[in-house]
Amino acid sequence: MTNRHKKEYYNEGGCGLEIEFAVEYEPRCRVYIGTGLQKLKDFVGSRGKFTTDPSIGSFLNVEIVLRPFPRDELHEIFSGIVDILSFYENFKFTDHCGVHATFRAEADLKKAFYEILTDGRYDSSRFRHNKYKADFMKTATASSGRLRSYEEYITYQEKVGTKYCGVNFLKAHLVEIRTLNLDWDDVTFFYDAYEEAEARIAAQTAQ
């Protein structure tokens, strides 16, 4: 299933990942590159799909879109993909590439997630500061220096363009964190925040 932002599997729990990488083509490396791409395809299997992404700006630009998985399963898949990408020298994680994490969240959970990220623990080093304005705390802070409320952030995000904010609270129950580093610790940081938001909502509901 997709929503209007073309994000698949948004109705499933867990964390979904989109991993972008570039391929530097050399005629003499054609078989080598083809082998690497086949290894990736076989490893991902039915757990995700491959698409092209022209914004990466290489001869061949690839985006792996993984279904949402629980943390332990996702770690195994992520690590395997990184192993293959790291082995083949023609596969590059350039300044135009990034890892995007997606979570399903209803309105209350989105708000709790936003409040947890803006309570002082946010770490901008977890983002790749490329052509996208990925520094979430800058977009969460008004020109006066005051932190925007969740409702104000949503209005601002829609005004400037959701694609270019580091953390996007999209329609159809979706939260997207864009342009992360190719590092499991960074994915875990946001997984922790998401699960803390879930626990907060559960505690409020139980009262």
Name each model feature, range by range.
Residues 97-99:
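Short, conserved phosphate-binding/catalytic loop or strand-edge motifs used
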